[in-house]
């Protein structure tokens, strides 16, 4: 599923917030323009992710089609990404999926894991290194641990979707 309406609404709210911040002198015009450039970059990254997704699915088809349940974990702003990811798994492949902030995940949900569980970890910001350590630990329990990352150190690893953001 591609939900352009939600994406468009989110972009509208972000642009509205930038414009309001500039008009209320919370941000300078230059700061507002810098945020707008980041939003443009985000759109390019989104296109890159969409371009990579079919090959990732093809490479991991057996694992993905055999999922019976999943966790999707993020940190910082990517907690929202994790929540949306969990929702999409429920909508598209009809499996129970929970979204967690990564620290929540390691304080309970990971304890009940078995090798049949699927776990998707999304890095970003200050929590990137922590997510990477948790990814390594999760791989001890299940072969179905996946990492979505912008860290080039992981780009050739199994079960990793590397998204360059330069």
Language model: regions and residue ranges:
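A SIS-like phosphosugar-recognition module
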Residues: 1-166
